[in-house]
Amino acid sequence: MNKQLAKQNEPATLQVIACGALARELMVLLDQLPDGAVSLTCLPAAWHNHPEKIVPGLKRKVVAARRKGMQIAVAYGDCGTGGTLDAFLEAEQIPRIAGPHCYEMFLGKVKFDAEMETALGTFFLTDYMVRHFERIVMKGMGIRQYPGLRDMYFGHYTRVLYIAQTDCKKLRAKARQAAIELGLDYEYRYTGYGDFHGFLSKLA
């Protein structure tokens, strides 16, 4: 997703630049803020598979926002950038939501650490990943075409943990099926929007 998603009633003074995989959740939260307070623009979620594109894409978004005189905040994890994302944001003095990835942002650091201590071999699914599991994992990682890749990629995992942003029976069923596809145990935690709610509320 590479288009601006914004409240239209009034010109926003703050723009959040985010991963497209978070767009649906962030828009729900933005709907709870005063109209026009914050606008949202996203980089493509598919760039998780091409992290070298993230920082250059972010730079372009920052330049565009500053030309409009907007303040900027970022809803991204490191996402495979090897620290270059944080180095850029620090140099530009742009705030980012705390956490290395969205799994910790949804669960919160304490709960995330506890889950990892319970089972280090955890493959996390969010609502977005459940919705797009076939495209991202089964086809995107080549498992549909080459089934032997499943154990190569997931042989060291022990469970799928679906951390849900919404209470949706259909998504729970899809997440359980995803675990079956991967040959892993299945567990479920409802997280809601985790740390993102507080992050956006403070910005507004």
Walk through the language-model features, giving the residues of each:
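Gly/Ser/Thr-rich loops at beta-strand to alpha-helix junctions
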Residues: 17-24, 47-48, 75-85, 103-105, ...
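Long, charge-dense
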Residues: 83-136
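A conserved mid-domain beta-alpha-beta active-site/ligand-binding segment of alpha/beta enzyme cores
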Residues: 117-171
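A short beta-strand-loop structural module common to alpha/beta enzyme folds
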Residues: 36-54, 188-192
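Glycine-rich, highly charged phosphate/nucleotide-binding loops
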Residues: 51-64
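C-terminal, charge/polar-rich interaction regions
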Residues: 164-204
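Short helix-loop-beta junction
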Residues: 31-40, 179-184
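N-terminal basic/disordered segments at the start of proteins
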Residues: 2-33
